[in-house]
């Protein structure tokens, strides 16, 4: 599934995983440039304050599959 970062970049979720060190749930995702990133699941699906607005850090671009 693809998501748009609040700063404008588009990313595709590769998978969700568990961090070995402390069992934190993480999201593995890839940018359009091919760079792979890992972020705690709570942060990936969390919100950010931008000016007076609270926005999702990553907003879904693709409709949910049924």
Regions found by a protein language model. Give the residues of each.
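Mixed-charge, low-complexity intrinsically disordered regions
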Residues: 1-66
């Amino acid at each position: 599934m693809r998501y748009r970062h609040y700063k404008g970049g588009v990313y595709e979720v590769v998978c969700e995983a568990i961090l070995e060190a402390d069992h934190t749930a993480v999201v593995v995702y890839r940018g359009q440039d091919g760079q792979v990133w890992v972020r705690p699941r709570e942060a990936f699906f969390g919100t950010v304050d931008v000016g007076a607005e609270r926005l999702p850090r990553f907003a879904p671009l693709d409709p949910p599959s049924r």
